[in-house]
């Protein structure tokens, strides 16, 4: 990276193939649809792509295969200005890919092939990058070579004063134990409502947020779709971040990743907690208005113009 502030995103890197609008029912034959779009995606790569669109100097650490999908991801990220020096190519493995048919109402089905993404390595170069970044977004919970070792790069980054955020994707039976290990190094943990309930066993979101904070995270933001987000700050104050109302939802697949990117981008620009969360919600709303990872997001200023005004 050439200039601060810098963000390092670590973890899931995939390509999303979005088809819309479709009828989510079995059929035999050919149907014409409006669009098929491809984009780099995933809790790490999607966040990196959106952050770069918001003019954050961003680097991605992840893994792809030596195939057309991997070359596409790399090329699109480079075109967007993302540093891909830490994007590994793993021989003999396919790139992670996700097929997402979406109907006219925004409902979707998701078909995911894990591929190389979960097998990224814990390298010295990754540790060095984490130690120098202004912010680290960790989206690697469940990665075989990272679970149990995240503290090796998160602890030095936190000691340096970097902003450390974390998100989940499809948590499994070992995710809660991994979170108990790494949340003491996390400033803001940002799971979805489904993920928060799964890992804590709490159906009540405020109780889930408190449980996650008790595991060591500085603050918790639980993303809850059209209901906005539940935020528990580092002082223990609980609040709700309303979702930005939009006329038509097109594709919500990357809304969680874009929320994270928006929060990080605003925080790195010095926005206080409340303003950063509202900017995050505005960013997610722009992504929901169009297909694939970026939706109709064009710039930081565009998102800022629709963020709800308040004192912070």
Residue ranges and their predicted role:
Residues 89, 100-144:
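Conserved phosphate-binding/catalytic loop of the ribokinase/pfkB sugar-kinase fold
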Residues 58, 84, 164-165:
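Hydrophobic beta-strand scaffold residues
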Residues 1-11, 32, 156, 173, ...:
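Conserved phosphate-binding/catalytic region of the ribokinase-like
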Residues 1-63, 68-75, 79, 249:
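Glycine-rich phosphate/adenosyl-contacting loop at the front of the ribokinase-like
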Residues 49, 97-101, 109, 228-232:
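Short beta-strand scaffold segments in enzyme catalytic cores
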Residues 135-210, 227-228:
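Conserved beta-alpha-beta core of the PfkB/ribokinase-like small-molecule kinase fold
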Residues 125, 196-197, 229, 303:
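A generic structural signal for short hydrophobic patches within well-formed alpha-helices
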Residues 76-93:
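A glycine-rich helix N-cap at a beta->alpha junction
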């Amino acid at each position: 990276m050439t200039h601060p502030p810098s963000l390092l995103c670590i973890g899931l890197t995939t390509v999303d193939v979005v088809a819309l609008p479709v009828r989510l029912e079995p059929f035999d034959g050919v149907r014409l649809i409006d669009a098929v779009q491809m984009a780099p995606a995933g809790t790490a790569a999607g966040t990196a792509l959106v952050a770069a669109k918001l003019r954050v100097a961003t680097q991605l650490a992840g893994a792809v295969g030596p195939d057309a999908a991997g070359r596409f991801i790399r090329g699109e990220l480079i075109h967007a200005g993302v540093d891909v020096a830490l994007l590994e190519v793993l021989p003999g493995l396919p790139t992670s890919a996700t097929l997402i048919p979406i109907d006219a109402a925004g409902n979707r089905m998701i078909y995911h092939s894990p591929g190389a993404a979960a097998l990224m390595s814990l390298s010295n170069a990754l540790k060095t990058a984490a130690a120098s970044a202004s912010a680290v977004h960790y989206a690697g919970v469940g990665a075989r070579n990272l679970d149990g070792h995240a503290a090796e790069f998160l602890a030095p980054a936190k000691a340096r004063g970097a902003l450390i955020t974390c998100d989940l994707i499809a948590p499994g039976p070992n995710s809660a134990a991994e979170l108990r290990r790494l949340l003491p190094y996390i400033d803001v943990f940002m799971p979805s409502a489904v993920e928060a309930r799964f890992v804590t066993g709490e159906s009540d979101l405020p109780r889930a947020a408190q449980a996650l904070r008790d595991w060591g995270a500085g603050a918790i933001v639980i993303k809850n779709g059209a209901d906005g987000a539940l935020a528990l700050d580092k002082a223990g104050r609980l609040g709700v971040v309303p979702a930005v109302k939009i006329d038509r939802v097109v594709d919500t697949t990357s809304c969680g990743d874009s929320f994270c990117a928006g929060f990080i981008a605003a925080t790195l620009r010095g926005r206080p907690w409340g303003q950063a969360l509202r900017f995050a919600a505005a960013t997610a709303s722009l992504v929901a208005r169009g297909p694939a990872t970026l939706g109709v997001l064009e710039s930081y200023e565009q998102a800022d113009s629709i963020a709800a005004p308040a004192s912070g």
